[in-house]
């Protein structure tokens, strides 16, 4: 369960960071 969450977070967090800061 945790490894799955970590995998999702690893993909979602950079995408959110990209959208918020507009630094991709």
UniProtKB/Swiss-Prot annotation:
Q: Which UniProt keywords apply?
A: Amphibian defense peptide, Antibiotic, Antimicrobial, Cytolysis, Disulfide bond, Hemolysis, Secreted
Q: List the disulfide bonds.
A: 18-24
Query: Do the record's keywords include Nucleotide-binding?
Result: no
Source superkingdom: Eukaryota
Q: Does the keyword Disulfide bond apply?
A: yes
Q: Which GO terms describe its biological process?
A: defense response to bacterium; killing of cells of another organism
- Record's GO cellular component, any one? extracellular region
Q: In which tissues is it expressed?
A: Expressed by the skin glands.
- What is its subcellular localisation? Secreted
Name the Pfam families for this protein: Antimicrobial_1
Family the UniProt entry places it in: Belongs to the frog skin active peptide (FSAP) family. Brevinin subfamily.
Q: What is the protein's known function? A: Shows antibacterial activity against representative Gram-negative and Gram-positive bacterial species, and a very high hemolytic activity.
Q: Can you say what this protein is called?
A: Brevinin-1
